[in-house]
Swiss-Prot record:
It comes from Methanocaldococcus jannaschii (strain ATCC 43067 / DSM 2661 / JAL-1 / JCM 10045 / NBRC 100440) (Methanococcus jannaschii). This is Ribonuclease VapC2. GO terms for molecular function: magnesium ion binding; RNA nuclease activity. It is an enzyme of class 3 (hydrolase). Its cofactor is Mg(2+). The lineage of its organism: Archaea, Methanobacteriati, Methanobacteriota, Methanomada group, Methanococci. The keyword Zinc-finger does not apply.
Length: 149
């Protein structure tokens, strides 16, 4: 097995990979293990964190967004340790004003929704050219290589 160069093993992880991992999907678990074992350097950003937390909160409470907003005390009883432990194995990349500017052109050029555009612009800003995702929308982005599972 050939060793990867540093730039080859830098991979951005989309929210759906982390969500599928939390749901027990084997393919996602294998990828997460590679990050844990430091075979690949995994990156996420605040968009991914927000999406994963929102999914996890809805899934564990079995409540809709509106119900949680109406009864925020529901959040007190949640155990979020498993989610934050998952986040801890990744390098968390900050968003900044330049990334926001880049996202504007990415929305237009690749016809992406804002969160996906912010993910792509994060990759572009930090010079990460690989993304791991189950989302086919990223296939439209010519500067990203989709890591197939």
């Amino acid at each position: 097995m050939r060793r990867l160069k540093m730039e080859e093993n830098k991979i951005f992880f989309d929210s759906n990979i982390l969500i599928y991992h939390l749901c027990g999907k084997v393919e996602a678990k294998k990828l997460i293990e590679k990050v844990e074992n430091k075979e690949i350097c995994g990156f996420i950003n605040p968009i991914v964190i927000s999406e994963v937390l929102f999914f996890y909160i809805r899934a564990t409470t079995n409540k809709r967004h509106y119900d949680i907003k109406k009864h925020p005390e529901i959040l007190k009883s949640l155990d979020l340790d498993i989610v934050f432990e998952l986040f801890s194995i990744f390098q968390i990349l900050d968003l900044n004003s330049e990334i926001v500017k880049i996202s504007r052109e990415i929305i237009k050029k690749y016809c992406l929704l804002p969160n996906d555009a912010l993910i792509c612009s994060t990759c572009k800003f930090y010079k990460i050219n690989k993304i791991c995702s189950f989302d086919d929308d990223f296939k439209r982005v010519d500067f990203l290589e989709i890591i197939e599972i």
